[in-house]
Structure formats: C-alpha cells, structure tokens
C-alpha cells in the first residue's frame, strides 16, 4: 500500500480507498459527503466513516470509499478537506478495513451497500474441492480487479500464469504500463539559458514564438534546421527550450515521450533518420516500428523538430529535388555564419596597466 506521505511521486489507483484524517473534528456524515462528491467521476457505491479515539486523547476519522471504477489520481492532496490532509491507502482487503473502522467508533456514518472482496481465483485451481478450473479470461479479470500497482500486477500474472508470463512478458508489461502509467516527474531543465548565457539569431526568435512557446496544437507547426560548425553551442541552446525528446546517433522510438514540447535530432545523418518526413512535417499521427519492439502509434499533436547538423553532414546535400522541396516547405532553414556562437563569451577580467 502506498501512503501519501512518501517522498516518491504519488500515485493512487484502487476501487477501494482507505482514508485516515488525523485530528479532524468534522462529523463523519459531513466528511463522507465530501469524499462521495470528490469520487463522483468514478461512481461511488459505498462509504463508511467513523471517528476513533486514541489513548492520548486525540481523535481521527477513518473512511472507506468503494467505487465502480478505480479511483485514479496523482495528486496527493486530492482528498484534502478544509485543510485536513489524510493518509491514503489502497484497501487490498476491504473486509478487514471495514472491520477495523467499525471496531470501537465514537460516531459512524454509512451510505450504500458494502461490497465484500470477491474470492480470488489465484491459487484455487490446485485445491481438490475446487468446482472447476478458472479460464484465463477469469484469471486476468481477477488480476486486473485486485492489482493496485504495476509490480503487483506482474507478480500476480507470474504466479497465476507462469507459462504465459515467461513467453509473453512483453505484452503483460505493455498492459501493466497502460493500467499503471508512470508518473511524469517535474521537468528540471538540464541546460538553463543562463548557464552559459545563451543567445540566438532574431529570425529564430520569430520561429520560437508560434512553434515552441504557443501550445496551440490545432495548428500545424514548422520544424527548424540548423547547420554549422561543431562546438558552437547549438545543441545546448536547442536543449534549453523545454521538455523534449533527444536523439543522437539514431532515432530510438522506444524511448519516445508524448509529454514533450518538441523533438531534437542531433548529428544523425539524413540516410539514418527514419520517418524524417513525419518529424520535419510535424505530422500529428503516424506509425513507427522500433527495433526489437512492436509497432506503435505516435501521436505528436503537431510537434516541431529541431534538426542539428554539422557542415560535413548537411542534410540538404543528400536530398533529391523532391525531398528538398518538402524540406523547405515544412522547415525553417538556418545556416550559421563563420564565427557565430550560440552563447556569449565569458567576460575577461580587466587587465592591470603596467
């Protein structure tokens, strides 16, 4: 069970949510109604809330809410009520949680019909008194209903369907990622614009506003192509603009992140860049075939790509006339001038007069 007090990124997914509000003076009925309203999106079916007294004289409220669809949130403050922050847990055994709540309540409120945890198929097939062996569909339905995390889901599959787990692990990992998606951590720019003091040409500033800084996915973006010498700071500048996918040497679609603003293709020869038209053209949806992986649909939301190339691997020199026409129509082309840099040179200390 995952507590909201963890320092790790918070994630909660469960149809049975157990909440504890320390030192909360509100009535169980009032708290129950507030929790019921908070969970309205997932269709509440049952709630019980009780006040408990501790030996030190303090009181707390315990609540169990059951919903038709699993409550899903990455906001650790989602269940906060009037400044009172609860401990949030997935009630793996709602029967035991309900027994605990109703043990010695000072006040209690209940609404709806309690749903006991369904008897799990897991491990029952080996018992001699089992009515019949459950089907794989029944086993997977049971696992999906009870799993509360990616790790628990995969562990239950491994225990219940060992052969399928060993031969189809990739598919189970895919479904686990869909059921329990990773939490997007807060983006910390590894290349802030002030370290070093980065700068760019005025014409590129005009490109930045509509294509990077404006989150209008209804209009089709334009990409940016920069060609010039090495060690000029163009990669550092490109990576300073915000959250992005970064590819060097090859385009690895298995690491593609949809929650980005733009893509960067850095020092990859034209002939080794698959789907270059889709990237340059900021196409909204297309299918790619990652190496050693299954085909996947990429939904770009018209995401621009910044292509960085050194002069000796200029993409435009490798293109056919038709390819170059498409490239120029969908991409701003910027050729660096001799001696041009993407950062301000450090100030030299004043020299002492002799």
From Swiss-Prot:
Enzyme Commission no: 2.7.7.-, 3.1.21.-
One Pfam family here: Gemini_AL1
Chief subcellular location: host cell
Keywords: ATP-binding, Covalent protein-DNA linkage, DNA replication, DNA-binding, Endonuclease, Helicase, Host nucleus, Hydrolase, Metal-binding, Multifunctional enzyme, Nuclease, Nucleotide-binding, Nucleotidyltransferase, Repressor, Transferase
Protein name: Replication-associated protein
UniProt xrefs under InterPro entries: CRESS_DNA_REP (IPR049912), Gemini_AL1_MSV (IPR001146), Gemini_AL1_REP (IPR001191), Gemini_AL1_REP_central (IPR022692), P-loop_NTPase (IPR027417)
Role of this protein: Essential for the replication of viral ssDNA. The closed circular ssDNA genome is first converted to a superhelical dsDNA. Rep binds a specific region at the genome origin of replication. It introduces an endonucleolytic nick within the conserved sequence 5'-TAATATTAC-3' in the intergenic region of the genome present in all geminiviruses, thereby initiating the rolling circle replication (RCR). Following cleavage, binds covalently to the 5'-phosphate of DNA as a tyrosyl ester. The cleavage gives rise to a free 3'-OH that serves as a primer for the cellular DNA polymerase.
Cofactor(s) for this UniProt protein: Mg(2+); Mn(2+)
Domain-level remarks: There are 3 rolling circle replication (RCR) motifs. RCR-2 is probably involved in metal coordination. RCR-3 is required for phosphodiester bond cleavage for initiation of RCR.
Entry binding sites for a divalent metal cation: 52, 62, 104
GO MF entry, a single one: structural molecule activity
Cofactor binding note: Divalent metal cations, possibly Mg(2+) or Mn(2+).
Span(s) of short sequence motif RCR-3: 100-103
Residue interval(s) of motif Nuclear localization signal: 291-302
Residues the record marks as active site: 100
Taxonomy of the source species: Viruses, Monodnaviria, Shotokuvirae, Cressdnaviricota, Repensiviricetes
CRESS-DNA virus Rep endonuclease domain boundaries: 11-114
A biological process from GO: DNA replication
Entry keyword Hydrolase: yes
Subcellular location: Host nucleus
Domain of life of the organism encoding this protein: Viruses
Protein family per UniProt: Belongs to the geminiviridae Rep protein family.
Disulfide topology: none
Motif RCR-1 per record, residues: 18-21
Subunit structure: Homooligomer. Rep binds to repeated DNA motifs (iterons). Forms the O-complex, which is a Rep-DNA complex involved in the initiation of RCR. Part of the C- and V-complexes which are RepA-Rep-DNA complexes involved in the c-sense and v-sense transcription.
GO cellular component, one term: host cell nucleus
Region: Transactivation, residue numbers: 251-269
């Amino acid at each position: 069970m995952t507590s909201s007090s963890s320092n790790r990124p918070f994630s909660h997914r469960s149809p049975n949510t157990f909440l504890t509000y320390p030192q909360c003076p509100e009535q169980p009925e009032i708290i129950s109604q507030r929790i019921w309203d908070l969970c309205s999106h997932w269709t509440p079916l049952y709630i019980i809330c009780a006040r408990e007294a501790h030996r030190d004289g303090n009181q707390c409220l315990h609540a169990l809410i059951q919903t038709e669809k699993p409550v899903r949130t990455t906001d650790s403050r989602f269940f906060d009520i009037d400044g009172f922050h609860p401990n949030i847990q997935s009630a793996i055994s709602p029967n035991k949680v309900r027994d605990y709540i109703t043990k010695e309540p000072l006040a209690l409120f209940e609404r709806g019909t309690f749903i006991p945890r369904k008897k799990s198929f897991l491990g029952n097939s080996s018992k001699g008194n089992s009515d019949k062996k459950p089907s794989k569909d029944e086993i997977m339905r049971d696992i999906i209903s009870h799993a509360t995390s990616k790790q628990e889901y995969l562990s239950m599959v491994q225990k219940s369907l060992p052969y399928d787990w060993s031969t189809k692990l990739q598919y189970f990992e895919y479904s686990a990622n869909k059921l329990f998606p990773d939490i997007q951590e807060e983006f910390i720019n590894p290349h802030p614009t002030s370290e070093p003091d980065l700068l760019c040409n005025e014409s590129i500033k005009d490109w930045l506003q509509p294509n990077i800084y404006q989150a209008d996915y209804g209009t089709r973006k334009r990409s940016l192509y920069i060609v010039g010498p090495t060690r000029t700071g163009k990669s550092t500048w490109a990576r300073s603009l915000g959250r992005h996918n970064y590819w060097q040497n090859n385009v690895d679609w298995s690491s593609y992140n949809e929650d980005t603003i733009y893509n960067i293709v850095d020092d990859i020869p034209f002939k080794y860049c698959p789907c270059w038209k889709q990237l340059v053209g900021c196409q909204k949806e297309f299918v790619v075939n990652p190496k050693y992986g299954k085909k996947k649909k990429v939904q770009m939301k018209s995401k621009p790509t910044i292509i960085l190339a050194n002069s000796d691997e200029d993409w435009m020199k490798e293109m056919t006339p038709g390819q170059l026409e498409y490239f120029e129509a969908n991409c701003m082309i910027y050729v660096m001038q001799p001696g041009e840099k993407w950062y301000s040179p450090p100030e030299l200390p004043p020299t002492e007069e002799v």
